[in-house]
């Protein structure tokens, strides 16, 4: 596809954090049956004058599930290079990720679409868009207490999270900022057997295991030379592995420092400072909570354990915690690396003490869940990886 064929398509506005700092162009719009609605959208498609907006006036906006689009690449940013490398590592068609490169709004529609990378070459990135209106983040579920009274739903979501985490781990990818705001759930499919409805996002924060400290400039040249081979559905795994060996994550220095400090009392659960496990903030553009930053392979298990605990609390506990108290209590659990479990000797009843003001009885209904969480939160020397946890405790 050349410049002349691209120029006939309309631009779509992107939010400011688009990693390519360029623009999308529409190739065609698809309805539910994948029939072509309109191969070419005129220049007035996004006009404020609704009389000129044939697409919206034809009420086709409700038919869009996916859009095939082309991203014209002039210069790949560092963020884009990281995401592209992760996608090459795990495969462009992974069902375990809500895909990358930011959001954009379709003007006039109450929709938020997120592009999915299909393939790439030296000049173009071919993508399709996923309608994010059908998803909600795990953070939304926890805050809205959508799982209230439904341990079945809680366990289903956790199975999906474990399946996605296993997929990442088996491809030697560590998601460094895994938290409820980075996990998307396909709401309409909850309760089904399709575990791919739970997906991870923010792939630019992933770290490829075994990566070196080579520069992004060398990565850029190596990625460009191999991109044509990765544009097909079945990527050349050998080429991808070679590219990934050259991958440089900006957080490598932090990760190396963490490894040097593994002998201290805090072990690999967190590092002190802004990018620490204890770091919590609501100041980013999506208002996501970031309690911890994953720094090694089996720390992913620890992170999933905290997520499991949050989801369980939102399901079984009636009390709504003040936000600061809730965050501080989670921070203490992360810092200590364990749950505070005690037994009432008079009644021989076990309790989980979330903080000084809130204790939760460990009934037969949730004792297995608590046991699994304790396994995920144990000391790093004995804590299982996601793969080990699934094999040893779930089968």
From Swiss-Prot:
Q: Does the keyword ATP-binding apply?
A: yes
Positions of ATP binding = 15-23, 54
Alphabetized GO MF terms: ATP binding; protein kinase activity
Q: Which UniProt keywords apply?
A: ATP-binding, Nucleotide-binding
Chain segments carrying region Disordered: 213-266
**Which part of the chain is the Protein kinase domain?**
9-395
Q: What's the superkingdom here? A: Eukaryota
Per its UniProt record, what InterPro entries does this chain match? Kinase-like_dom_sf, Prot_kinase_dom
Q: What Gene3D superfamilies does its record include?
A: Transferase(Phosphotransferase) domain 1
Q: Does the keyword Disulfide bond apply?
A: no
Domain comment from the record reads as follows: The protein kinase domain is predicted to be catalytically inactive.
Query: What does the similarity note say?
Result: Belongs to the protein kinase superfamily. Ser/Thr protein kinase family.
Q: What is this protein called?
A: Probable inactive serine/threonine-protein kinase DDB_G0293746
């Amino acid at each position: 596809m050349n410049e002349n064929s691209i120029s006939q398509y309309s631009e779509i506005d992107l939010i400011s954090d688009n990693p390519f700092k360029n623009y999308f162009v529409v190739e065609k719009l698809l309805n539910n049956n994948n029939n072509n609605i309109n191969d070419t959208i005129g220049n007035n498609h996004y006009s404020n004058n609704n009389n000129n907006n044939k697409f919206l006036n034809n009420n086709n906006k409700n038919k869009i599930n996916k859009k095939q689009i082309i991203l014209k690449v002039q210069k790949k940013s560092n963020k884009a290079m990281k995401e592209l490398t992760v996608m090459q590592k795990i495969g462009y068609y992974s069902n375990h990720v809500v895909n990358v490169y930011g959001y954009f709004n379709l003007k006039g529609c109450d929709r938020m679409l997120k592009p999915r990378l299909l393939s790439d070459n030296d000049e173009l990135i071919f993508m399709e868009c996923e309608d994010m209106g059908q998803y909600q983040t795990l953070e939304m579920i926890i805050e809205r207490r959508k799982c209230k009274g439904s341990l079945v739903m809680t366990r289903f979501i956790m199975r999906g999270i474990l399946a996605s985490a296993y997929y990442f781990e088996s491809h030697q990818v560590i998601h460094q900022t895994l938290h409820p705001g980075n996990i998307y759930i396909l709401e309409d499919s909850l309760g089904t057997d399709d575990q791919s409805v739970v997906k991870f996002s923010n792939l630019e924060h992933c770290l490829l295991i075994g990566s070196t400290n080579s520069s992004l400039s060398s990565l850029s040249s190596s990625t460009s030379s191999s991109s044509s081979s990765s544009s097909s559905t079945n990527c050349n795994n050998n080429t991808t592995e070679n590219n990934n060996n050259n991958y440089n994550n900006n957080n490598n220095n932090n990760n190396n420092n963490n490894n040097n400090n593994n002998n201290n009392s805090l072990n690999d659960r967190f590092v002190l400072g802004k990018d620490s496990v204890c770091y919590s903030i609501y100041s980013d553009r999506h208002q996501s909570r970031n309690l911890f930053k994953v720094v090694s392979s089996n720390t992913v298990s620890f992170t999933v354990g905290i997520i499991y605990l949050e989801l369980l609390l939102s399901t079984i506990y009636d009390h709504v915690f003040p936000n600061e108290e809730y965050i501080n209590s989670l921070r203490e659990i992360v810092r200590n690396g364990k749950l505070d479990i005690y037994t009432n000797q008079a009644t021989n009843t076990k309790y989980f003490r979330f903080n000084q003001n809130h204790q939760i009885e460990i009934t037969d209904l949730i004792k297995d869940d608590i046991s699994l969480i304790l396994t995920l939160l144990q000391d790093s020397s004995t804590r299982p990886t996601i793969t080990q946890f699934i094999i040893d405790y779930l089968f």
